[in-house]
Amino acid sequence: IALSLVGSEMCIRDSFYGCKYALPLMRDSGNGSIINISSISGIVAGHNFTAYNSAKAAVRHLSKSVALHCARTTKLVRCNSLHPVFAKTEILEALLSDTSNDMLSKLERQIPVRKLAEIEDIANAILFLASDESKMITGTEIVIDGGLSAQ
């Protein structure tokens, strides 16, 4: 098995430093919601993305650990993670531009609802987690995967 951490360390490093530097500011202001963006790959492993899967799983557990820390030190700062499936983004479109429509169809077939996530699906989850409507939600993951993890 060929393993490489190239690029994957950034996945956890950015979330770690985001939490580290946001927490004091949020405590000073009295409240806040940290939303770490992970991936469905942090919940459902794949055979060819070992480092990426591991890094995204680390973001999931970092979020849980920060949530528990905050719950014990201040009741007003929450921390959760978001785990979207493949989404219609410019990055994905660029990756697929060199391939046929077969690759897009293959991705869609992996998802029980047979379609990719829309950016709005992810944005709506972020808005919910950032709002007071989620004031009792901390230390959890929101999975936006069209049923992929239910299989």
Show which residues each predicted segment covers:
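Single conserved hydrophobic/aromatic residue that forms the stacking wall/gate
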Residues: 1-7, 12
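Active-site helix of classical SDR
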Residues: 19, 55, 63
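Alpha-helical segment proximal to the catalytic Tyr-Lys
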Residues: 24, 68-72, 135
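Residue(s) in the substrate-gating loop at a strand-loop-helix junction
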Residues: 39
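Short C-terminal tail/terminal secondary-structure segment
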Residues: 44, 126-127, 138-151
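Active-site loop immediately N-terminal to the catalytic Tyr-X3-Lys motif
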Residues: 44-50, 72, 114, 132
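Active-site loop-to-helix junction immediately N-terminal to the catalytic Tyr of the SDR YXXXK motif
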Residues: 45-53, 65, 95
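Short, small/polar-rich loop/turn modules that mediate ligand/substrate recognition or access, typified
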Residues: 71-78, 137-139
